[in-house]
Amino acid sequence: MGDSGDAVMARWLQSAGLQHLAASSTSSSSASTAGGGVDPRGGGGVGVGALGGGAGGGSLLPSLLMQGYGPQSIEEKQRLYMLLRSLNFNGETAPPSISEPYTPTAQSFGGGNSLEGFYSPELRGELGAGLLDLHAMDDTELLSEDVASEPFEPSPFIPKEMDEDDDDMLPGSQPGPSDNYNAVANEKESTARENNVAKIKVVVRKRPLNRKEVSRKEEDIITVHDSSSLTVYEPKLKVDLTAYVEKHEFCFDAVLDEQVSNDEVYRETVEPIIPIIFQRTKATCFAYGQTGSGKTYTMQPLPLRAAQDMVRLLHQPVYRNQNFKLWLSYFEIYGGKLFDLLSDRRQLLMREDGKKQVCIVGLQEFEVSDVQIVKEYIERGNAARSTGSTGANEESSRSHAILQLAIKKHIIVTDTRRQRDRDANESKNTKAVGKISFIDLAGSERGADTTDNDRQTRIEGAEINKSLLALKECIRALDNDQIHIPFRGSKLTEVLRDSFVGNSRTVMISCISPNAGSCEHTLNTLRYADRVKSLSKGSNTRKEQPTGPTIPSSKDSSSAPSYPMPIETEEIANQIQEKRPVETSRKAAENFTSNSSMEPDRNPVSMIPSYSNRGKEENGSSGLNDRERVDLNSSRISYNSKPQSVQSSANLQEEEKVTKVSPPRRKAYRDDKPERQSNYAKKDSGPETSRPGYKVQQAKQLQQQQRPTSASASQNSSRQSEKESSCDDVEIDAILEEEEALIAAHRKEIENTMEIVREEMNLLAEVDQPGSLIDNYVTQLSFLLSRKAAGLVSLQARLARFQHRLKEQEILSRKKSSR
């Protein structure tokens, strides 16, 4: 049975990659049986020579190896390692034998506990701590260089489409799970790329010095440090005319120096926006800067490159199957008016439809499918654009040119009745998907630099600056996510209204001049751009305003504790009560019908003679309803009043309502406040003053005493006013008559003057005739001039009299008003 155990061990070692141990195990099998070895079938006894010189370990090895397939302890694993180490101390290796891999049988799983009683003293000495130090042992002999590698076979459960490319797929094959995974990954990448596109991007481009500036030996005052920052060195003079340089640093999304080409400008500004236009995005790209800074030069190639990329995307199957088409329109805004540059400068009208969408009536759009056609349209529009000469640029753009490239989806018409008119109304059968607008703004100007310009040029500059300011405010509102965007500030922002709402993107290219003479213009442009760029999302203006302290209404006041209010709190309540809206007073007036038991002298609300006065009175009186109830209850308890007193109090309440029709003045009420406070203090002093109808009786007596005097005074004042009004009417009628006479005299004088002028013209014509007499000319001219002078003198005298009458009337009116 020893040979069979050696064969099993050899096969197992080969399957485990330990072929070099097969020779040592085979040679030790005979020695193990002679020295009292271990039965290879996993017997019970172990001889003394089992570990003698390492020879007996070969028979112990198969049983230990078989234990690896069943449950084993840490000590058994350590014994296996020590036996494997003792088998190859001499370093002898045997050539690997080719055999089938060994598969253990069911009998081999039963030797899990065959060596539980095996504890060698030598093994106990080395493994006394119970743990094996693997770093202290030399296990390099366990590795073999002659390991036969077998070819790797893929798992049959993995689909083969994962290893194949999409281009190698068969035409009729269905997309597998890998296609869906790739589609999801691509969609995530595109979404991330769209999110990375900023809502507002500010790019600054510096132009090189031109010939005129080089001939004047002007210096370059702008230094571009990296792709996002620059420094402006502004030359200045101190008060003592000492020259110094002031440094200004700016940071933007991108800074392009004079070495950057237009292709790089396109890749930095417009190229990231093109893919998202096909996903219902409206983009705007405009160049801003002083006149002569290179705006038109920067903007000219951008629409061509954008059209090229858009046409390329339209040819893709995704968009071609959706019937997407590219449309082009080109117009300008000059002096607040719109002109179509592709239709012989025909004037356009801007209207709003029922959906609050801006529509340009009469604007002609052209469907384009080739970049060459786009180039021809742009050249045609540039030739018709308004230009002029300024002090800084001989051919300056005096209008805002807007080139729009729109992606529209064509709707297939199936009705035969509408099919005949489809060619005529092809643009109506489309649905807008996205749009990008390229705006070549007119140059900004300062009033100090336009002194040598004519009036028309200055008017153009004022209109340009107004529209640029409105555009800046719209961009600020857009970046702050404000609800209201002031697009009605100018025609430019009204036209671009749809580019500032919804899903929109804006790219601003600030063009600057590097010469020292344009330093102030450059700084203004950079500050304009920096103000647009520096807008943060955190400074949102749509924040909730802090709510101030609120005063409880009449409903809440009834539940409040009924304590007497001090003077300071009453004044504060009066001030806040005056600022209440009319609605609050109306609500209080409605509540007054249910809470009508109150006193007029205890009304804590300021009485203003206005239409909302009554509501405020009732509101304030209802506010002290509980306190009055406490007073009434105390008076009833102290005096044990009978039901007759209830009837008298009801009568008094009716009298109170009558007195409330004519409220007292505010001034008198304010003077009466200390008296009311003293009345509050005197409540507990005597029984008569605490009665609720006592003060009402006093008020009635005072009113009866004042009635005759007030009636007589009112009669006298009415008589005097009637006399004064009759006198005033007479004087006003006289003044009006004199005014009409003066106007008639002026008209007559104008007619006489015109007649005299005709006679003078005839007189000059006669003098020019040959043979005319100079004496007749002098005599007639003297007569005409005297007539003219007499008419002017009479008109001037009439005017002086009327002016004197007006002054007298003004003095009298002042005296009457002082009385």
UniProtKB/Swiss-Prot annotation:
The keyword Cell inner membrane does not apply. GO terms for cellular component: endoplasmic reticulum; Golgi stack; intracellular membrane-bounded organelle; microtubule; secondary cell wall. Ubiquitous. ATP binds at G289, Q290, T291, G292, S293, G294, K295, T296. Residues 199-535 form the Kinesin motor domain. Residues 577-589, 614-631, 669-686 have a biased composition (Basic and acidic residues). Residues 632-652 have a biased composition (Polar residues). One of its GO terms (biological process) is regulation of cell wall organization or biogenesis. Its main location: other. Residues 150-178, 534-729 are annotated as: Disordered. SUPFAM superfamilies: P-loop containing nucleoside triphosphate hydrolases. InterPro entries: Kinesin-like_fam, Kinesin_motor_CS, Kinesin_motor_dom, Kinesin_motor_dom_sf, P-loop_NTPase. Pfam families: Kinesin. Belongs to the TRAFAC class myosin-kinesin ATPase superfamily. Kinesin family. KIN-13 subfamily. This is Kinesin-like protein KIN-13A. It comes from Oryza sativa subsp. japonica (Rice). The lineage of its organism: Eukaryota, Viridiplantae, Streptophyta, Embryophyta, Tracheophyta.
